[in-house]
């Protein structure tokens, strides 16, 4: 087969989009070593028109000039729009984040001509190999990206991999345009058909969310063990994870509630890039903090259950590794993640609480008591996730 050039557009709001990009890039490169696989960070491309970046660039520029005489080595970077989302997750709050969605979609509408021009100019650049396929793993921008691609060339295929369990219309994942839609759940595929936007042979249903290759590899010699982490081999063990930036507030709440209840639950905390969280847990009994690592699967393998945010990626990873889940569902749950909670409830994959602070002690006791039942539900109700290979 002749060599192909594939572009995968992603951004870093939350981390799941980058994970999907890496997983797809790795598989495509392994199967087709002669293909050119190019990840494209859309946020970086759009930085010149990002209003958050413009504002913070002006503010940090002034502050950096003031700091120069007294702290010449301190340099405050400007923010990108996605940093607002990631900062909120790091603080452990999603309150108000639902309001970001209409603001973001308004930005896309307002700046559509400028966004299209940036994309077209990139594709027209002689240094950019002409793609055979443009693949998107991001929501909200698929209309403007498709229009830009068609302005550049009429014969280049466009596909979207939905990294949520369902669409959240309008103008979130699905748009009225001639493209391929790759859906990770029967409900998302049903939504795609119901729109009437796509012909049947351009709707593909795969067996789940995109997971990294590490979640399919067997345990490796020398991998983490409970004893090696300073934990008791026979005590119930929770893996606590709130994405690549961790969550100080939520994690401290969870650990405090477990300690207060005296349930004997120990924990592995995936802190990601949150060094404040990592440092705060280093001497905490019955708790092993882990910084930013690429082998999350190895830590899930030695945990009994998962506690965290109801994101589609982390839930899918936990369930794939056989870990039942404890998650929150309340007014602060992001609109596009509410369907993930229903997926957990409908399939008996774990426990949904309204508040970690108020309800976690009871949920933890119930999880320990009924752990075997939840694991049996995972085995019976969830097909093996082979999506990245499919």
What are these regions (language model features)?
Residues 15, 20, 84-197:
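Active-site and donor-binding regions of nucleotide-sugar-utilizing enzymes
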Residues 315-362:
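Catalytic binding pocket for nucleotide-activated donors in carbohydrate/polymer assembly enzymes
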Residues 23-35, 152, 257-263:
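A short, Lys/Arg-enriched amphipathic alpha-helix followed by its capping loop at the start of a domain
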Residues 301-311:
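Acidic donor-binding loop of glycosyltransferase active sites
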């Amino acid at each position: 087969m002749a060599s192909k050039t594939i572009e995968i557009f992603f951004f870093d709001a939350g981390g799941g989009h980058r994970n999907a990009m890496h997983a797809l890039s790795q598989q495509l490169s392994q199967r087709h070593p002669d293909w050119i696989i190019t990840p494209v960070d859309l946020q970086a491309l759009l930085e010149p028109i990002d209003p958050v970046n413009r504002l913070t660039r002006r503010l940090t520029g002034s502050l950096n000039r003031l700091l120069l005489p007294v702290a010449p080595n301190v340099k405050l970077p400007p923010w990108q729009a996605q940093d607002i989302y990631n900062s909120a997750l790091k603080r452990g709050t999603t309150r108000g984040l639902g309001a970001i969605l209409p603001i973001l979609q308004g930005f896309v509408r307002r700046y559509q001509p400028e966004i299209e021009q940036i994309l077209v100019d990139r594709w027209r650049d002689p240094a950019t190999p002409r793609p055979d396929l443009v693949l998107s793993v991001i929501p909200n921008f698929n209309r403007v990206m498709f229009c830009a691609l068609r302005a550049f060339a009429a014969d280049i295929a466009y596909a979207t991999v939905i990294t949520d369990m369902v669409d959240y219309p309008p103008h979130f994942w699905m748009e009225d345009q001639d493209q391929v839609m790759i859906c990770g759940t029967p409900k998302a595929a049903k939504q795609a058909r119901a729109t009437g936007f796509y012909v049947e042979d351009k709707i593909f249903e795969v067996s789940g969310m995109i997971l990294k290759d590490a979640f399919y590899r067997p345990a490796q010699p020398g991998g983490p063990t409970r004893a090696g982490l300073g934990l008791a081999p026979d005590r119930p063990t929770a893996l606590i994870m709130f994405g690549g930036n961790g969550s100080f507030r939520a994690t401290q709440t969870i650990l405090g509630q477990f300690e207060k209840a005296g349930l004997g639950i120990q924990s592995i905390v995936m802190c990601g890039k949150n060094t404040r969280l990592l440092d705060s847990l280093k001497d905490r009994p019955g708790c092993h903090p882990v910084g930013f690592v690429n082998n999350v699967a190895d830590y899930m393998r030695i945990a009994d259950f998962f506690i965290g945010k109801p994101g589609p990626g982390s839930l899918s990873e936990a369930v794939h590794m056989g870990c039942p889940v404890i998650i929150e569902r309340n007014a602060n749950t992001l609109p596009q993640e509410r369907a993930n909670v229903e997926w957990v409830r409908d399939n008996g994959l774990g426990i949904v609480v309204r508040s970690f602070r108020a309800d976690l002690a009871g949920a933890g006791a119930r999880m320990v008591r009924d752990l075997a039942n939840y694991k049996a539900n995972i085995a019976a109700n969830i097909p093996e996730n082979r999506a990245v290979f499919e």
